Swiss-Prot record:
Gene expressing this chain: SCP26
Keyword terms: Carboxypeptidase, Disulfide bond, Glycoprotein, Hydrolase, Protease, Secreted, Signal
Task of the protein: Acts as a positive regulator of grain size by controlling grain width, filling and weight. High expression of GS5 in the grain is correlated with large grain size.
Cystine bridges: 101-366, 263-274, 298-333
Entry-listed glycosylation sites: 152, 269, 301, 354, 375
Signal peptide range: 1-28
EC number assigned by the record: 3.4.16.-
A Gene Ontology BP annotation from the UniProt entry: proteolysis
Name under which the protein is recorded: Serine carboxypeptidase-like 26
Lineage, highest ranks first: Eukaryota, Viridiplantae, Streptophyta, Embryophyta, Tracheophyta
Active site, per annotation: 194, 403, 455
Organism: Oryza sativa subsp. japonica
SUPFAM superfamilies xrefs: alpha/beta-Hydrolases
Length: 482
Protein backbone atom coordinates (compact mmCIF):
# COMPACT_ATOMS: atom_id res chain seq x y z
CA UNK A 1 0.00 0.00 0.00
CA UNK A 2 2.88 2.36 0.87
CA UNK A 3 4.58 1.54 -2.45
CA UNK A 4 1.40 2.35 -4.34
CA UNK A 5 1.03 5.63 -2.47
CA UNK A 6 4.64 6.56 -3.25
CA UNK A 7 4.13 5.75 -6.92
CA UNK A 8 0.97 7.84 -6.98
CA UNK A 9 2.84 10.72 -5.38
CA UNK A 10 5.58 10.48 -8.03
CA UNK A 11 2.95 10.51 -10.77
CA UNK A 12 1.38 13.62 -9.26
CA UNK A 13 4.77 15.34 -9.13
CA UNK A 14 5.49 14.48 -12.77
CA UNK A 15 2.03 15.65 -13.87
CA UNK A 16 2.44 18.84 -11.88
CA UNK A 17 5.87 19.47 -13.40
CA UNK A 18 4.56 18.96 -16.94
CA UNK A 19 1.72 21.36 -16.28
CA UNK A 20 3.92 24.01 -14.79
CA UNK A 21 6.60 23.77 -17.46
CA UNK A 22 3.89 24.39 -20.01
CA UNK A 23 2.73 27.38 -17.99
CA UNK A 24 6.27 28.70 -17.53
CA UNK A 25 6.27 30.36 -20.92
CA UNK A 26 3.49 32.63 -19.72
CA UNK A 27 5.07 33.47 -16.37
CA UNK A 28 6.60 36.68 -17.73
CA UNK A 29 3.10 37.91 -18.42
CA UNK A 30 1.80 36.98 -14.98
CA UNK A 31 4.13 39.29 -13.11
CA UNK A 32 1.71 42.16 -13.51
CA UNK A 33 3.72 45.08 -14.89
CA UNK A 34 2.24 47.33 -17.49
CA UNK A 35 -1.55 47.22 -17.08
CA UNK A 36 -3.19 48.03 -20.45
CA UNK A 37 -2.49 45.10 -22.75
CA UNK A 38 -2.20 42.53 -19.97
CA UNK A 39 -5.45 43.74 -18.44
CA UNK A 40 -7.29 43.53 -21.73
CA UNK A 41 -5.82 40.07 -22.40
CA UNK A 42 -7.52 38.89 -19.20
CA UNK A 43 -10.93 40.19 -20.21
CA UNK A 44 -13.58 37.46 -20.40
CA UNK A 45 -15.99 38.34 -23.20
CA UNK A 46 -18.54 35.72 -22.26
CA UNK A 47 -18.49 32.34 -20.54
CA UNK A 48 -20.28 29.27 -21.92
CA UNK A 49 -23.85 29.22 -20.69
CA UNK A 50 -23.72 32.82 -19.49
CA UNK A 51 -27.06 34.64 -19.84
CA UNK A 52 -27.15 37.23 -22.61
CA UNK A 53 -28.19 39.96 -20.20
CA UNK A 54 -27.49 41.84 -18.09
CA UNK A 55 -23.96 42.67 -19.20
CA UNK A 56 -21.18 41.63 -16.83
CA UNK A 57 -17.70 43.15 -17.09
CA UNK A 58 -15.29 40.42 -15.99
CA UNK A 59 -11.63 39.44 -16.14
CA UNK A 60 -9.78 36.24 -15.23
CA UNK A 61 -6.23 34.98 -15.39
CA UNK A 62 -2.95 34.32 -13.62
CA UNK A 63 -0.80 36.71 -11.61
CA UNK A 64 2.71 35.64 -10.68
CA UNK A 65 3.67 35.80 -7.00
CA UNK A 66 7.11 34.13 -6.96
CA UNK A 67 9.12 34.03 -10.17
CA UNK A 68 11.94 31.89 -8.73
CA UNK A 69 9.56 29.14 -7.58
CA UNK A 70 7.20 29.62 -10.51
CA UNK A 71 4.12 30.34 -8.40
CA UNK A 72 1.04 32.01 -9.85
CA UNK A 73 -2.42 32.56 -8.41
CA UNK A 74 -5.63 32.55 -10.42
CA UNK A 75 -8.24 35.28 -10.04
CA UNK A 76 -11.73 36.18 -11.28
CA UNK A 77 -12.64 39.87 -11.19
CA UNK A 78 -16.00 41.57 -11.70
CA UNK A 79 -16.27 45.30 -12.16
CA UNK A 80 -19.00 46.96 -10.14
CA UNK A 81 -22.27 47.76 -11.79
CA UNK A 82 -22.47 51.28 -13.17
CA UNK A 83 -23.79 54.33 -11.29
CA UNK A 84 -21.44 55.47 -10.09
CA UNK A 85 -18.61 54.25 -12.33
CA UNK A 86 -16.67 51.18 -11.10
CA UNK A 87 -13.57 53.31 -10.52
CA UNK A 88 -15.48 55.21 -7.84
CA UNK A 89 -16.65 52.13 -5.92
CA UNK A 90 -14.66 50.13 -3.36
CA UNK A 91 -12.59 47.08 -4.27
CA UNK A 92 -13.49 43.98 -2.24
CA UNK A 93 -11.21 40.94 -2.18
CA UNK A 94 -12.97 37.66 -1.28
CA UNK A 95 -11.16 34.59 0.07
CA UNK A 96 -12.59 31.18 0.88
CA UNK A 97 -11.01 28.91 3.44
CA UNK A 98 -10.70 25.17 3.86
CA UNK A 99 -7.77 25.40 3.81
CA UNK A 100 -7.85 24.25 0.22
CA UNK A 101 -11.23 25.49 -1.05
CA UNK A 102 -11.69 27.63 -4.14
CA UNK A 103 -13.00 31.18 -3.90
CA UNK A 104 -14.13 30.78 -7.49
CA UNK A 105 -16.10 27.59 -6.87
CA UNK A 106 -17.66 28.89 -3.67
CA UNK A 107 -17.60 32.66 -3.27
CA UNK A 108 -17.92 33.64 -6.93
CA UNK A 109 -19.96 30.85 -8.50
CA UNK A 110 -22.12 29.75 -5.55
CA UNK A 111 -22.50 32.70 -3.22
CA UNK A 112 -21.94 36.39 -3.93
CA UNK A 113 -20.71 36.71 -7.51
CA UNK A 114 -23.01 38.05 -10.25
CA UNK A 115 -22.88 34.70 -12.09
CA UNK A 116 -23.84 31.49 -10.31
CA UNK A 117 -23.44 27.96 -11.61
CA UNK A 118 -26.84 26.41 -12.28
CA UNK A 119 -27.83 22.88 -11.33
CA UNK A 120 -25.71 20.08 -12.80
CA UNK A 121 -23.24 22.71 -14.00
CA UNK A 122 -25.24 23.10 -17.20
CA UNK A 123 -24.98 26.89 -17.40
CA UNK A 124 -24.66 30.12 -15.45
CA UNK A 125 -27.47 32.20 -14.05
CA UNK A 126 -27.52 35.84 -13.03
CA UNK A 127 -27.46 36.51 -9.30
CA UNK A 128 -29.62 39.54 -8.54
CA UNK A 129 -28.00 39.74 -5.11
CA UNK A 130 -24.42 39.82 -6.39
CA UNK A 131 -22.16 41.97 -4.27
CA UNK A 132 -20.83 43.73 -7.37
CA UNK A 133 -23.83 46.02 -6.94
CA UNK A 134 -21.87 47.58 -4.11
CA UNK A 135 -18.22 46.94 -4.98
CA UNK A 136 -15.70 45.71 -7.51
CA UNK A 137 -15.30 42.02 -6.65
CA UNK A 138 -11.96 40.22 -6.76
CA UNK A 139 -11.95 36.46 -6.11
CA UNK A 140 -8.62 34.74 -5.52
CA UNK A 141 -7.82 31.01 -5.57
CA UNK A 142 -5.35 30.72 -2.71
CA UNK A 143 -3.04 29.13 -1.68
CA UNK A 144 -1.15 27.59 -4.60
CA UNK A 145 -2.53 24.15 -5.36
CA UNK A 146 -6.11 25.35 -4.97
CA UNK A 147 -8.23 25.34 -8.12
CA UNK A 148 -6.28 26.67 -11.10
CA UNK A 149 -3.48 28.25 -9.02
CA UNK A 150 -0.14 26.50 -9.37
CA UNK A 151 3.50 26.28 -8.39
CA UNK A 152 6.54 25.05 -10.29
CA UNK A 153 8.15 23.91 -7.03
CA UNK A 154 6.43 20.83 -5.62
CA UNK A 155 7.90 21.38 -2.14
CA UNK A 156 5.78 24.54 -1.85
CA UNK A 157 2.75 22.33 -1.35
CA UNK A 158 4.38 20.81 1.74
CA UNK A 159 5.30 24.16 3.25
CA UNK A 160 1.91 25.84 3.33
CA UNK A 161 0.99 27.75 6.46
CA UNK A 162 -0.73 31.01 7.31
CA UNK A 163 2.40 33.15 6.81
CA UNK A 164 3.09 31.56 3.40
CA UNK A 165 -0.49 32.20 2.29
CA UNK A 166 -0.46 35.82 3.47
CA UNK A 167 2.83 36.61 1.70
CA UNK A 168 1.61 35.12 -1.58
CA UNK A 169 -1.71 36.96 -1.35
CA UNK A 170 0.12 40.22 -0.68
CA UNK A 171 2.42 39.66 -3.68
CA UNK A 172 -0.65 38.93 -5.76
CA UNK A 173 -2.25 42.23 -4.75
CA UNK A 174 0.88 44.26 -5.52
CA UNK A 175 1.13 42.72 -8.99
CA UNK A 176 -2.61 42.81 -9.64
CA UNK A 177 -2.69 46.55 -8.98
CA UNK A 178 0.08 46.95 -11.57
CA UNK A 179 -2.21 45.25 -14.06
CA UNK A 180 -5.29 47.21 -12.95
CA UNK A 181 -3.82 50.59 -11.93
CA UNK A 182 -7.18 52.36 -12.21
CA UNK A 183 -8.18 50.70 -8.91
CA UNK A 184 -4.99 51.54 -7.02
CA UNK A 185 -6.53 54.45 -5.11
CA UNK A 186 -9.93 52.88 -4.45
CA UNK A 187 -10.95 52.04 -0.91
CA UNK A 188 -9.84 48.43 -0.43
CA UNK A 189 -11.49 45.86 1.83
CA UNK A 190 -10.75 42.19 2.48
CA UNK A 191 -13.49 39.62 3.10
CA UNK A 192 -13.98 35.89 3.40
CA UNK A 193 -15.48 33.05 5.39
CA UNK A 194 -14.55 29.99 7.47
CA UNK A 195 -10.76 29.38 7.48
CA UNK A 196 -10.44 32.74 5.78
CA UNK A 197 -11.04 33.85 9.36
CA UNK A 198 -7.26 33.33 9.46
CA UNK A 199 -6.40 34.44 5.92
CA UNK A 200 -8.28 37.75 6.00
CA UNK A 201 -6.98 39.34 9.23
CA UNK A 202 -3.46 38.07 8.55
CA UNK A 203 -3.43 39.59 5.07
CA UNK A 204 -4.88 42.81 6.46
CA UNK A 205 -2.10 42.86 9.06
CA UNK A 206 0.56 42.33 6.40
CA UNK A 207 -0.86 45.12 4.23
CA UNK A 208 -1.03 47.39 7.28
CA UNK A 209 2.63 46.76 8.12
CA UNK A 210 3.85 47.18 4.53
CA UNK A 211 1.78 50.38 4.24
CA UNK A 212 3.79 52.15 6.93
CA UNK A 213 5.83 53.70 4.15
CA UNK A 214 2.99 55.64 2.55
CA UNK A 215 5.23 56.85 -0.25
CA UNK A 216 5.99 53.32 -1.45
CA UNK A 217 4.65 52.29 -4.85
CA UNK A 218 3.19 49.21 -3.18
CA UNK A 219 0.89 51.23 -0.89
CA UNK A 220 -2.63 49.72 -0.76
CA UNK A 221 -5.59 51.84 0.37
CA UNK A 222 -6.78 49.33 2.99
CA UNK A 223 -9.81 50.49 5.00
CA UNK A 224 -11.00 47.35 6.77
CA UNK A 225 -12.06 43.72 6.68
CA UNK A 226 -15.17 41.61 7.21
CA UNK A 227 -15.32 37.87 7.92
CA UNK A 228 -18.22 35.42 8.00
CA UNK A 229 -18.49 32.37 10.29
CA UNK A 230 -14.72 32.63 10.77
CA UNK A 231 -12.37 30.21 12.44
CA UNK A 232 -10.65 32.58 14.85
CA UNK A 233 -9.33 30.96 18.01
CA UNK A 234 -8.85 27.22 18.58
CA UNK A 235 -10.05 27.25 22.16
CA UNK A 236 -13.26 29.22 21.58
CA UNK A 237 -13.97 27.58 18.21
CA UNK A 238 -13.83 24.07 19.73
CA UNK A 239 -15.66 25.02 22.92
CA UNK A 240 -18.42 26.68 20.89
CA UNK A 241 -18.73 23.76 18.47
CA UNK A 242 -19.41 21.35 21.34
CA UNK A 243 -21.77 23.72 23.14
CA UNK A 244 -23.73 24.45 19.96
CA UNK A 245 -24.17 20.75 19.19
CA UNK A 246 -25.56 20.16 22.68
CA UNK A 247 -27.77 23.28 22.81
CA UNK A 248 -29.28 22.38 19.42
CA UNK A 249 -30.05 18.79 20.42
CA UNK A 250 -27.46 17.21 18.15
CA UNK A 251 -26.01 15.22 21.06
CA UNK A 252 -27.30 14.12 24.44
CA UNK A 253 -26.68 15.65 27.85
CA UNK A 254 -24.49 12.66 28.65
CA UNK A 255 -22.23 13.23 25.65
CA UNK A 256 -21.88 16.92 26.45
CA UNK A 257 -21.02 16.17 30.09
CA UNK A 258 -18.41 13.70 28.85
CA UNK A 259 -16.89 16.37 26.62
CA UNK A 260 -16.78 18.90 29.45
CA UNK A 261 -15.09 16.33 31.67
CA UNK A 262 -12.49 15.01 29.19
CA UNK A 263 -11.71 17.97 26.92
CA UNK A 264 -9.39 20.83 27.73
CA UNK A 265 -9.66 22.79 24.51
CA UNK A 266 -6.85 25.08 25.61
CA UNK A 267 -4.52 22.23 24.64
CA UNK A 268 -4.18 21.94 20.87
CA UNK A 269 -3.62 18.17 21.11
CA UNK A 270 -6.75 16.42 22.33
CA UNK A 271 -6.51 13.40 24.59
CA UNK A 272 -7.81 10.03 23.39
CA UNK A 273 -10.88 10.40 25.63
CA UNK A 274 -11.63 13.88 24.33
CA UNK A 275 -11.11 12.79 20.74
CA UNK A 276 -13.54 9.90 21.17
CA UNK A 277 -16.15 12.16 22.76
CA UNK A 278 -15.86 14.81 20.03
CA UNK A 279 -16.12 12.15 17.33
CA UNK A 280 -19.61 11.41 18.64
CA UNK A 281 -20.56 14.94 17.59
CA UNK A 282 -19.04 14.45 14.15
CA UNK A 283 -20.81 11.12 13.71
CA UNK A 284 -24.14 12.81 14.42
CA UNK A 285 -23.37 15.60 11.98
CA UNK A 286 -22.65 12.95 9.35
CA UNK A 287 -26.41 12.40 9.22
CA UNK A 288 -27.25 16.05 8.54
CA UNK A 289 -25.52 19.11 7.07
CA UNK A 290 -23.12 20.50 9.67
CA UNK A 291 -22.93 23.76 7.71
CA UNK A 292 -26.67 24.39 7.88
CA UNK A 293 -28.26 22.16 10.48
CA UNK A 294 -31.85 22.88 9.39
CA UNK A 295 -31.27 22.41 5.65
CA UNK A 296 -31.88 19.13 3.80
CA UNK A 297 -28.77 17.00 3.37
CA UNK A 298 -27.46 16.80 -0.16
CA UNK A 299 -28.00 13.28 -1.47
CA UNK A 300 -26.00 13.46 -4.68
CA UNK A 301 -23.62 10.59 -5.40
CA UNK A 302 -20.74 11.06 -2.97
CA UNK A 303 -18.12 8.72 -4.40
CA UNK A 304 -15.84 11.48 -5.70
CA UNK A 305 -12.59 12.62 -4.17
CA UNK A 306 -14.47 15.47 -2.54
CA UNK A 307 -17.03 13.23 -0.86
CA UNK A 308 -18.03 14.70 2.51
CA UNK A 309 -18.31 11.26 4.06
CA UNK A 310 -14.73 10.48 3.12
CA UNK A 311 -13.18 13.88 3.57
CA UNK A 312 -14.89 14.91 6.80
CA UNK A 313 -15.81 11.85 8.77
CA UNK A 314 -13.06 9.36 7.98
CA UNK A 315 -12.76 6.48 10.43
CA UNK A 316 -9.13 7.40 11.02
CA UNK A 317 -9.38 9.26 14.30
CA UNK A 318 -5.91 10.73 13.81
CA UNK A 319 -7.59 13.09 11.35
CA UNK A 320 -9.18 14.94 14.26
CA UNK A 321 -6.43 14.60 16.84
CA UNK A 322 -4.56 17.85 16.27
CA UNK A 323 -7.28 19.86 14.58
CA UNK A 324 -10.77 19.34 13.33
CA UNK A 325 -9.70 18.75 9.74
CA UNK A 326 -12.96 19.29 7.93
CA UNK A 327 -13.29 21.65 5.03
CA UNK A 328 -14.71 24.84 6.45
CA UNK A 329 -17.52 25.71 4.09
CA UNK A 330 -18.21 22.53 2.18
CA UNK A 331 -21.59 22.14 0.44
CA UNK A 332 -21.50 18.90 -1.56
CA UNK A 333 -24.33 19.78 -3.93
CA UNK A 334 -23.08 23.20 -4.95
CA UNK A 335 -19.50 22.01 -5.17
CA UNK A 336 -20.60 19.26 -7.54
CA UNK A 337 -22.26 21.81 -9.83
CA UNK A 338 -19.13 23.99 -9.79
CA UNK A 339 -16.88 21.02 -10.54
CA UNK A 340 -19.07 19.97 -13.46
CA UNK A 341 -18.91 23.47 -14.91
CA UNK A 342 -15.27 24.45 -14.38
CA UNK A 343 -13.95 21.14 -15.70
CA UNK A 344 -15.43 21.83 -19.14
CA UNK A 345 -12.76 22.54 -21.74
CA UNK A 346 -14.64 25.42 -23.36
CA UNK A 347 -15.14 27.04 -19.96
CA UNK A 348 -11.45 26.82 -19.12
CA UNK A 349 -10.53 28.21 -22.52
CA UNK A 350 -12.86 31.20 -22.15
CA UNK A 351 -11.61 31.62 -18.59
CA UNK A 352 -7.89 31.75 -19.54
CA UNK A 353 -7.30 28.82 -17.19
CA UNK A 354 -5.32 25.59 -17.63
CA UNK A 355 -4.21 26.66 -21.10
CA UNK A 356 -1.96 23.60 -21.48
CA UNK A 357 -4.74 21.18 -20.58
CA UNK A 358 -2.33 19.38 -18.24
CA UNK A 359 -3.83 20.31 -14.90
CA UNK A 360 -2.96 17.33 -12.64
CA UNK A 361 -6.37 15.73 -12.24
CA UNK A 362 -9.68 17.51 -12.43
CA UNK A 363 -10.33 20.97 -11.09
CA UNK A 364 -11.73 20.53 -7.59
CA UNK A 365 -13.64 22.97 -5.45
CA UNK A 366 -11.67 21.72 -2.43
CA UNK A 367 -8.28 19.99 -2.30
CA UNK A 368 -7.76 17.13 0.12
CA UNK A 369 -4.00 17.42 -0.46
CA UNK A 370 -3.90 21.03 0.74
CA UNK A 371 -6.12 20.32 3.74
CA UNK A 372 -4.13 17.32 4.92
CA UNK A 373 -0.66 18.84 4.42
CA UNK A 374 -1.40 22.33 5.75
CA UNK A 375 0.65 23.39 8.77
CA UNK A 376 -1.82 24.76 11.32
CA UNK A 377 0.69 26.73 13.35
CA UNK A 378 -1.43 29.72 14.39
CA UNK A 379 -3.90 28.99 17.18
CA UNK A 380 -5.50 32.41 17.62
CA UNK A 381 -6.09 35.45 15.43
CA UNK A 382 -7.43 37.58 18.29
CA UNK A 383 -4.16 39.51 18.81
CA UNK A 384 -4.38 40.70 15.19
CA UNK A 385 -7.95 41.89 15.80
CA UNK A 386 -6.81 43.93 18.79
CA UNK A 387 -3.93 45.45 16.81
CA UNK A 388 -5.94 46.41 13.72
CA UNK A 389 -8.90 47.72 15.71
CA UNK A 390 -6.50 50.04 17.54
CA UNK A 391 -5.10 51.06 14.15
CA UNK A 392 -8.55 52.30 13.17
CA UNK A 393 -9.52 49.76 10.50
CA UNK A 394 -13.21 48.97 10.07
CA UNK A 395 -13.77 45.43 11.38
CA UNK A 396 -17.00 43.41 11.12
CA UNK A 397 -17.75 39.79 11.88
CA UNK A 398 -21.00 38.13 10.79
CA UNK A 399 -22.37 34.70 11.59
CA UNK A 400 -25.14 32.58 10.12
CA UNK A 401 -26.83 31.21 13.24
CA UNK A 402 -27.61 27.74 11.77
CA UNK A 403 -23.96 26.81 11.20
CA UNK A 404 -22.70 23.92 13.32
CA UNK A 405 -19.13 24.01 11.99
CA UNK A 406 -18.15 27.52 13.09
CA UNK A 407 -21.19 28.36 15.21
CA UNK A 408 -22.33 31.75 16.39
CA UNK A 409 -21.51 30.71 19.97
CA UNK A 410 -17.83 30.37 19.03
CA UNK A 411 -17.79 33.81 17.42
CA UNK A 412 -19.48 35.40 20.43
CA UNK A 413 -16.85 33.92 22.73
CA UNK A 414 -14.09 35.24 20.45
CA UNK A 415 -15.49 38.76 20.20
CA UNK A 416 -16.18 38.97 23.93
CA UNK A 417 -12.58 37.89 24.60
CA UNK A 418 -11.37 41.10 22.93
CA UNK A 419 -12.76 43.06 25.87
CA UNK A 420 -14.06 45.94 23.77
CA UNK A 421 -16.48 48.41 25.37
CA UNK A 422 -20.03 48.16 24.00
CA UNK A 423 -21.26 51.11 21.95
CA UNK A 424 -24.73 49.84 20.99
CA UNK A 425 -26.22 46.86 22.80
CA UNK A 426 -27.49 43.63 21.21
CA UNK A 427 -30.53 44.37 19.04
CA UNK A 428 -32.48 43.14 16.00
CA UNK A 429 -31.97 44.28 12.43
CA UNK A 430 -34.65 44.01 9.75
CA UNK A 431 -35.27 43.22 6.11
CA UNK A 432 -38.75 43.44 4.57
CA UNK A 433 -40.23 44.05 8.04
CA UNK A 434 -38.85 40.75 9.34
CA UNK A 435 -36.04 40.17 11.81
CA UNK A 436 -32.98 39.37 9.70
CA UNK A 437 -30.67 38.82 12.67
CA UNK A 438 -29.08 40.63 15.58
CA UNK A 439 -26.05 42.82 15.99
CA UNK A 440 -23.95 44.48 18.63
CA UNK A 441 -21.65 47.46 18.07
CA UNK A 442 -18.45 47.72 20.04
CA UNK A 443 -16.01 50.60 20.00
CA UNK A 444 -13.94 49.46 17.05
CA UNK A 445 -15.92 46.44 15.83
CA UNK A 446 -19.39 45.19 14.87
CA UNK A 447 -20.73 41.64 15.20
CA UNK A 448 -23.81 40.61 13.20
CA UNK A 449 -25.88 37.43 13.17
CA UNK A 450 -27.96 36.36 10.17
CA UNK A 451 -31.11 34.53 11.20
CA UNK A 452 -31.62 31.15 9.54
CA UNK A 453 -28.38 31.24 7.54
CA UNK A 454 -25.75 28.55 7.71
CA UNK A 455 -22.02 28.70 7.05
CA UNK A 456 -22.48 30.24 3.58
CA UNK A 457 -24.50 33.35 4.39
CA UNK A 458 -24.57 34.87 0.86
CA UNK A 459 -25.89 31.56 -0.48
CA UNK A 460 -28.45 30.84 2.25
CA UNK A 461 -29.68 34.42 2.76
CA UNK A 462 -28.67 36.43 -0.32
CA UNK A 463 -30.83 39.51 0.31
CA UNK A 464 -29.61 39.75 3.89
CA UNK A 465 -26.03 39.24 2.74
CA UNK A 466 -26.29 42.10 0.25
CA UNK A 467 -27.78 44.43 2.85
CA UNK A 468 -25.03 43.49 5.28
CA UNK A 469 -22.14 44.14 2.89
CA UNK A 470 -23.73 47.43 1.81
CA UNK A 471 -23.86 48.61 5.43
CA UNK A 472 -20.27 47.51 6.02
CA UNK A 473 -18.83 49.19 2.94
CA UNK A 474 -20.62 52.45 3.67
CA UNK A 475 -19.88 52.39 7.39
CA UNK A 476 -23.59 52.48 8.15
CA UNK A 477 -25.74 50.92 10.83
CA UNK A 478 -28.08 48.07 9.91
CA UNK A 479 -31.80 49.01 9.97
CA UNK A 480 -33.26 48.66 13.46
CA UNK A 481 -36.95 49.19 12.73
CA UNK A 482 -39.54 47.45 10.62
Amino acid sequence: MAVAAAAAARRRDVSCLLLLLCFSSSMAATGGGGGGGEQEADRVARLPGQPASPAVSQFAGYVGVDERHGRALFYWFFEAQASPAPEKKPLLLWLNGGPGCSSIGYGAASELGPLRVARQGAALEFNQYGWNKEANLLFLESPVGVGFSYTNTSSDLSNLNDDFVAEDAYSFLVNWFKRFPQYKDNEFYISGESYAGHYVPQLADLVYERNKDKRASTYINLKGFIVGNPLTDDYYDSKGLAEYAWSHAIVSDQVYERIKKTCNFKNSNWTDDCNAAMNIIFSQYNQIDIYNIYAPKCLLNSTSASSPDRAFFANNQEQFRWRIKMFSGYDPCYSSYAEDYFNKHDVQEAFHANASGLLPGKWQVCSDQILNSYNFSVLSILPIYSKLIKAGLRVWLYSGDADGRVPVISSRYCVEALGLPIKTDWQSWYLDKQVAGRFVEYHGMTMVTVRGAGHLVPLNKPAEGLMLINAFLHGEKLPTSR
